[in-house]
């Protein structure tokens, strides 16, 4: 029965279960008594919900703690083995697939290089299918335990009624790619063989996935407003505010920093990414006379640039490499100052493989430029730091997508998709006559 708000008893029950699960997940182990103020539920509701979750195998007891009355209170926590999650990072050089338990402990991983076909859609779909099957086998987890597959991809994600998540990835040559539909077997709407049909895909922007991971488990935890920057071959950002708790991806890398400037991968000129992305950074070093090793990939070339600019053995710095890094710090600082002025975050975090590889010394110079160019008030209250989760942050963030949906369902497993009932024979006959 629905109340005035339109919510049914089942809805309220699901929300109560979700509230208890989330508090135990982020703040557990906790006692039943501590859950009452933490969730805003009555003690009776907490007791009933906990009893259900224990019976479902989602929660387990984890010792006890003393109380003023002398009787110990039993502590509760999420049972990590009660389900598993897959996170996928469709990155710039490879597709990385990781299997996690509910506590986000890594159980297995698989990687597939993108190779000469690059972002060929069929190749990427095949890599995801193979990777999911591989990690489930390596982690010795049954497909029925899987709560969902989260995928972080470059580009703008459009949610559509008929095809699910559609990816608009201009810089990688994806124009309205119906990725969610392609990940399922054509014509059936089912997942690849071996996975139950009810296992859902959750597809989102890679920078947003990175941001979600840092906000839940990394350097952004506890902040109400933050911007998390992904610095790899290209650059992107995720903006998290109190009004948009899940965060939203912004195409920050395609902010124009020089009118009529360098050609960007997106086709425009003068984008920030054309100056500050790792691909552009290495290209500018080559143009200035730098010499990365023959056949070096992007990550290796960036490592060599850093070694030339900041030699570890006491040799003199290569002035060409040092000048390219200094100019890049200035461009990135200008881009960050725009984010500070626009969104006025408490924290501005830099992640992505290139951002982490460039490290703290480079960040100091970027921070100096950003704070010098931003408005004084927002600049005075923002902290600019490196992210904490390392190169796996996108896969962790992608796995958070099915985890968040699991909480929203109150800990219930995904249900099989309902198929429409077949049309009666008279309808088929009538349709045939009307053609």
Predicted regions and their residues:
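Short glycine-rich anion-binding loops that position phosphate/pyrophosphate groups of nucleotides
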Residues: 65, 154-157, 232-234, 354-355
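Short, ordered coil/turn segments that flank beta-strands lining enzyme active or ligand-binding pockets
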Residues: 81, 102-103, 160-162, 241-242
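Glycine-rich phosphate-binding loop and adjoining helix at the ATP-binding site
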Residues: 106, 111-225, 251, 361-372
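AAA+ ATPase active-site-proximal loops
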Residues: 208, 235, 350
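Glycine-rich phosphate-binding loop of actin/hexokinase-like ATP-binding domains
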Residues: 219-276
């Amino acid at each position: 029965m629905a109340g005035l708000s339109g919510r049914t008893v089942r809805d309220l029950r699901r929300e109560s279960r979700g509230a208890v699960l989330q508090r135990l997940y982020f703040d557990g182990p906790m006692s039943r008594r501590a859950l009452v103020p933490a969730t805003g539920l009555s003690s009776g509701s907490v007791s009933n919900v906990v009893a259900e979750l224990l019976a479902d195998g989602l929660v387990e007891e984890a010792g006890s703690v003393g109380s003023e009355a002398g009787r110990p209170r039993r502590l509760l926590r999420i049972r990590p083995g009660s389900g598993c999650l897959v996170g996928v990072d469709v990155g710039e050089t490879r597709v990385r697939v990781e299997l996690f338990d509910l506590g986000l402990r890594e159980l297995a991983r698989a990687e597939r290089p993108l190779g000469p076909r690059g972002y060929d859609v069929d190749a990427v779909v095949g890599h995801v299918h193979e990777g999911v099957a591989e990690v489930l086998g390596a982690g010795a987890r049954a497909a029925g335990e899987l709560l969902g597959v989260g995928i972080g991809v470059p580009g703008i994600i459009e949610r559509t009624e008929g095809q699910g998540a559609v990816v608009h990835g201009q810089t990688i040559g994806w124009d309205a790619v119906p990725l969610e539909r392609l990940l399922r077997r054509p014509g059936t709407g089912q997942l690849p063989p071996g996975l139950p049909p009810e296992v859902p895909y959750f597809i989102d922007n890679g920078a947003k996935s990175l941001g979600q991971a840092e906000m839940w488990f990394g350097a952004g935890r506890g902040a109400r407003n933050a911007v998390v920057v992904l610095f790899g071959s290209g650059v992107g950002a995720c903006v998290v505010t109190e009004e948009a708790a899940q965060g939203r991806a912004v195409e920050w890398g395609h902010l124009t920093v020089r009118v009529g400037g360098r050609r960007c991968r997106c086709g425009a000129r003068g984008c920030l990414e054309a100056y500050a992305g790792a691909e552009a950074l290495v290209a500018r070093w080559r143009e200035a006379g730098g010499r990365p090793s023959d056949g070096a990939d992007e990550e290796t070339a960036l490592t060599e640039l850093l070694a030339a600019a900041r030699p570890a053995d006491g040799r003199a710095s290569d002035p060409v490499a040092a000048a390219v890094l200094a100019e890049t710090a200035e461009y990135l600082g200008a881009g960050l100052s725009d984010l500070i002025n626009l969104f006025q975050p408490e924290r501005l975090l830099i992640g992505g493989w290139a951002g982490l590889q460039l490290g703290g010394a480079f960040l100091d110079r970027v921070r100096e430029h950003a704070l010098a160019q931003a408005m004084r008030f927002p600049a005075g209250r923002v902290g600019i730091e490196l992210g904490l989760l390392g190169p796996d942050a996108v896969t962790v963030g992608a796995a958070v997508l099915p985890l968040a949906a699991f909480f929203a369902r109150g800990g219930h497993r995904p249900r099989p998709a309902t198929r429409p009932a077949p049309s009666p024979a008279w309808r088929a006959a009538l349709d045939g006559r009307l053609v």
